[in-house]
Amino acid sequence: MKKFSCGFEVTKEVIGGKWKGLVLYFLMNGPKRTSELKRIIPNITQKMLIQTLRELEASGLVSRKMYNQVPPKVEYSSTELGESLKPILQELCQWGGYYAEQEYAEGEYEIVQPEQLS
């Protein structure tokens, strides 16, 4: 059993890293296929996207639904536990926008639509 000094450490362990929060954030708007997530998050590699989805699934934050059809179809969605993070992720998103506008950021950050990233 891992031991932590506060709940923030547990949160960071579960949703920390470069992509987990972002993938979760976009799944909060409804189920997505990997190709849809890849379009929304163009800077993530296919391998890293699959790894991130598997880790989020193992943590109980994301569910994977496989359809019995040809070609195979797989959708990912946030679970009830994952949805409990929605207000937190929305607040982090708002704070990021606020920070990007501050003088400390010195024009280093610009919030754009996903299609403008590729």
Curated annotation (Swiss-Prot):
- Ranges for domain HTH hxlR-type come to 6-104
Q: Which UniProt keywords apply?
A: DNA-binding, Transcription, Transcription regulation
| A GO term, aspect molecular function | DNA binding
Q: Does the keyword Transcription regulation apply?
A: yes
**Which Gene3D superfamilies does the record associate with it?**
Winged helix-like DNA-binding domain superfamily/Winged helix DNA-binding domain
Q: Which domain of life is it from?
A: Bacteria
What is the name of the protein in this document? Uncharacterized HTH-type transcriptional regulator YkvN
Organism whose genome encodes this protein: Bacillus subtilis (strain 168)
